[in-house]
Regions:
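Hinge/cleft segment of the Venus flytrap/periplasmic-binding protein
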Residues: 282-329
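Hydrophobic alpha-helical segments within soluble ligand-binding/sensing domains
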Residues: 126-168, 268-288
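An alpha-beta-alpha
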Residues: 36, 54, 143-194, 294-309
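Beta-alpha junction/loop-to-helix N-cap segments that form part of ligand/metal-binding clefts
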Residues: 77-133, 228-243, 247, 252
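C-terminal motif of bacterial Sec signal peptides marking the signal peptidase cleavage site
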Residues: 17-20
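Bacterial signal peptide processing site
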Residues: 22-24
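Structural motif
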Residues: 70-92, 202-216
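Extracytoplasmic "Venus flytrap"
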Residues: 33-55, 61, 72-81, 176-178, ...
Length: 329
């Protein structure tokens, strides 16, 4: 009898250990349906790609839309008051996790909750924006990925001055976007080091973008568009002016490059969204809290060149550039 009891105890202990080991791993396979709130400041290819990457990471790790996950997707259409209302709605609905796709989107949800887990992406300066204390110590309920590589702007502005011969650089941005202010400051610093001048044009809505581009005609040798949600959402207006007036247009990310920019130092936003999705998986699995996950950055930036856009905008392509850039296929 004693041997039987010992054997039974061993079996039960082993079963409990196995159950404990598998509980976190199998969190996605339970009966619970998770509601994930998605807040995005505006529609444009980079942000849309980040969201697709986020969903892909969740699906590949057992959190599938229509199965055990429901996405409540909200787009603010570049309206700050809409973004604030979306934040209130998602928090009021008590979603299980929030995916904040842009700096203002993340700020607005963080202002509304210190309890619901938040993962952000497409954020240029999370510390400067007040989203996190530091990359290593994000905060109680928030973490995510930044879309900034420290080499990106120096690479692009350096190429504009040293290789494309730009002595004056026009920059269009929304001064209401904190992420844009950070980028424009860096553009000015690099340009000054290179002996070039920067002409800034600030706008507040996408309807002002074309007029801003037209105001730079005859005043600049090239234009640089940062990762600014307002301007990027109306990028075709800038491309039209650049093509008509032979002004090389340099941009802040690869999706804008594909739309008609000459060159960009960047990475794939879908990959960045996927990276953020893996963070969400750890949180949903119960493996880690947001405060225990460091803010992450994209991999090294690569300067990529669009030959077709260069020809359209009157920029002569030099043979030696083949050693400096990757050409868009």
């Amino acid at each position: 009898l004693r041997k039987s009891l010992l054997l039974l105890s061993s079996v039960l202990a082993g079963s409990l250990m196995l159950a404990g080991c598998s509980s976190e791993k199998d969190a996605a396979s339970g009966d619970k349906t998770y509601t994930i709130g998605v807040t995005q400041i505006v529609e444009h290819p980079s942000l849309d790609a980040a969201y697709e990457g986020f969903k892909k990471a969740l699906a590949e790790n057992g959190y599938k839309e229509g199965d055990n996950v429901k996405f409540d997707v909200q787009n603010a259409q570049n309206d700050q008051s809409n973004s604030q209302s979306i934040a209130k709605k998602l928090v009021g609905d008590k979603v299980d996790l929030i995916f904040a796709n842009s700096t203002p989107s993340a700020l607005h949800v963080l202002n509304e909750t210190k309890e619901i887990p938040i993962v952000f992406t497409s954020v240029t300066d999370p510390v400067g924006a007040g989203l996190v204390e530091s990359f290593e110590k994000p905060g109680e309920n928030i973490t995510g990925t930044t879309d900034t590589n420290p080499d990106a702007i120096p690479q692009t502005v350096g190429f504009m001055v040293d290789e494309a011969g730009a002595e004056t650089i026009g920059v269009i941005y929304n001064s209401g976007e904190q992420n844009s202010e950070v980028q424009v400051k860096q553009v000015n610093e690099i340009a000054k080091e290179k002996g070039a001048e920067v002409v800034e044009v600030s706008i507040s809505t996408s309807a002002e973008v074309k007029q801003a581009a037209e105001s730079l005609v005859g005043r600049v040798d090239a234009i640089y568009i940062p990762k600014d949600n307002t301007v990027v959402s109306a990028l075709e207006s800038v491309i039209s002016v650049a093509n008509d007036k032979d002004i090389p247009l340099f941009v802040g990310e690869l999706d804008s490059l594909k739309r008609g920019g000459v060159a960009a130092s960047g990475f794939n936003y879908e990959d960045l969204g996927y990276q953020t999705g893996l963070m969400a998986v750890k949180i949903l699995n119960g493996e880690k809290k947001p405060s225990e996950i460091n803010v992450e950055t994209p991999e090294s930036a690569v300067l990529t060149f669009n030959k077709a856009a260069a020809e359209e905008q009157g920029l002569e392509i030099k043979d030696e550039w083949a050693d400096l850039v990757e050409f868009l296929e």
